[in-house]
Amino acid sequence: MAQNIPTKRQSAFGVFVKSKVKGPTIQQTGATKTPKTPSKIRRLSIRKSTRKIKHALKGKSGSQPVAAHKDMPVTQNTGQGEEGVKLKGYKMKTSPARVQEPQRTGSPEENSIGKGNIKTNIKGSQNVQAGQKFQERIATQHPQKRKPFGIEDSDDKTPVKRVRSDTAKSVQSPAKAVDVGEVEDSTEEAEKMFEWLIHPVKKEKFFSELWEKKPLLVKRHLESYNDGWFSTEDLTKILHENDIQFGRNLDVTTYEGGQRETHNPPGRANPAVVWDYYQNGCSVRLLNPQTYSQGVWRLCSTLQEYFSSMVGANIYLTPPGTQGFAPHYDDIEAFVLQLEGNFSQEEIGEAILDVTLEPGDLLYFPRGTIHQASALPDTHSLHITVSTCQRNTWGDLMEKLVPAALTMAFSEDVEFRQALPRDYLDYMGLANADLDDPRRKAFLETLQSLLSRLVNYVPVDAGVDQKAVEFMRDCLPPVFTKNERACSIYGCRTRLEKGRVVGSVDLKTSTPVKLIRKGAARLVMEGEQVFLYHVLENARVYHGAELQPIEVPPEAAPAIEYLMHSYPEYVTVDSFPLDHQQDKIDLAMLMFEKGIIIAQEPASVDN
């Protein structure tokens, strides 16, 4: 949001970056001549600017910056639970499905996965230029001296971290993994996915030096590195096979002469209509690709467990020589990969970095980065935006904690209930801010004392549980492998044959079970009640339905905690810490029927 962006900022990726790195301010310059660039590339610019955000965004374009929460692709539930269902001490807490427009994430540059070339040109730092020349000389004259995990900037104080990878061929893309076995540990799988995303940068270095601090550019020199997630063929298939609606699922836009226009007609986005807009210079944005693409669904659902925050995606297709979106910024962390074609960055200030993204390359930039991009004249551009950590800050957590702490303090501490001084209006307020009055000093000291004591009443764990429930409401459901599906409720072969039910589910006390994913469920206290929240009934459309938590008897809570803490190991139903065997089976059946747990072997039998 605008109030979170400082006056001084550094720009990155055709964007101005929310500056947390000291450096010179930015000056607006005229447009520069676009250098010759090869086919199938995407050029982006990282630049500096002294102009205020509103001037940088409105001065030329006349459009406001777009916050990530207004543009983020969405993923979530469609089904509703049964109202008032009771099951041996358990009942469903239900509410009607909430209809909500999909959120959208800014522009084609924000976060993307794709194919492209990155050509860097960092200005304003002789040390960086000297380092680049040295690295190029080493690479050409002494290739054996290259670092095994890439060549990095010689100066960590540069506005953008640049890394060249020579080991990408040795890394298997998760998009090409065979979908047969099971996810033994979803935490490890999520970590592997993120390591693949930022390879060859080590995750420890990424979070200590780059995360929320500065952009990262990785050149991999391997076009196939990002293959398998999405393609123009996938987009065509989605348009033909699904009810894609203009405005809700897809936008067609242009940005010319400083004016951004959305050209969405009402109704379904039929392929012939979409491609006609495209032929006439419109950019195409698919807002929720995870709803229709198995690959994007898997990418987002895996990474959301790594970040403990919603991960969204947008697809952007831009015709040659055009631009679809005005400069803007988003309140999310963004990862950019180019899939097809090229993208260039229009000059909007002194360049910190001019980049040409090639297939397989990565560009990360922190929240607050102002960005815009356009396709080069010789080819189209296709990329995916992957974004995370929206409304997932310390401030967002404190919004929940502070009101609850005040309520408790009012109840338990008499000083919070004492009246304000009868004459405090005489020396407090803006009109009295410069008064040298001892009463004013005493007032502020009392307030500071109360604020320091307020910390003692903060219900941290309860507040974190509320954040966890919000996260689960935003989550995508997990992607089941073939084996997992066979061992879950979704693989049961229960059916009616000749008037007789066969293939019923059979869980015994000896059956080994485990959670489908570590983050698939959350046990939460709400007043005197205990609820089990889960994401298994979430839809792949954002907020397609409300969560359907299960109210469980308090005595069942230790057994659920036992299952959670045992992950990723299988445990037998008999090992549940409950007094009666039937209670163990009832709890296991309830969680199995909701998809929260899976058995080690297929659980349905023909009877």
UniProtKB/Swiss-Prot annotation:
Cofactor: Fe(2+)
Biased composition (Polar residues): 25-37
Gene Ontology terms: biological process: negative regulation of DNA-templated transcription
Catalyzed reactions per annotation: L-histidyl-[protein] + 2-oxoglutarate + O2 = (3S)-3-hydroxy-L-histidyl-[protein] + succinate + CO2; N(6),N(6)-dimethyl-L-lysyl(36)-[histone H3] + 2 2-oxoglutarate + 2 O2 = L-lysyl(36)-[histone H3] + 2 formaldehyde + 2 succinate + 2 CO2
Keyword Nucleus: yes
The protein's name in its UniProt record: Bifunctional lysine-specific demethylase and histidyl-hydroxylase NO66
Family: Belongs to the ROX family. NO66 subfamily.
Pfam families referenced in this protein's UniProt entry, alphabetically: JmjC_2, RIOX1_C_WH
Basic residues composition-biased segments: 39-58
Gene3D superfamilies on file: 3.90.930.40, Cupin (2.60.120.650), JmjC domain-containing ribosomal oxygenase (ROX), dimer domain (1.10.10.1500)
Chief place where the protein resides: nucleus
Region annotation Disordered: where it falls in the sequence: 23-121, 139-184
Composition-biased stretches (Basic and acidic residues): 156-167
Positions contributing to Fe cation binding: H328, D330, H371
Domain (JmjC): residue spans on this chain: 188-405
Free-text remark on how the cofactor is bound: Binds 1 Fe(2+) ion per subunit.
UniProt KW keywords: Chromatin regulator, Dioxygenase, Iron, Metal-binding, Nucleus, Oxidoreductase, Repressor, Transcription, Transcription regulation
EC primary class: oxidoreductase
Subcellular location(s) per record: Nucleus
Lineage: superkingdom: Eukaryota
UniProt-recorded Gene Ontology molecular function terms: 2-oxoglutarate-dependent dioxygenase activity; histone H3K36 demethylase activity; histone H3K36me/H3K36me2 demethylase activity; histone H3K4 demethylase activity; histone H3K4me/H3K4me2/H3K4me3 demethylase activity; iron ion binding; peptidyl-histidine dioxygenase activity
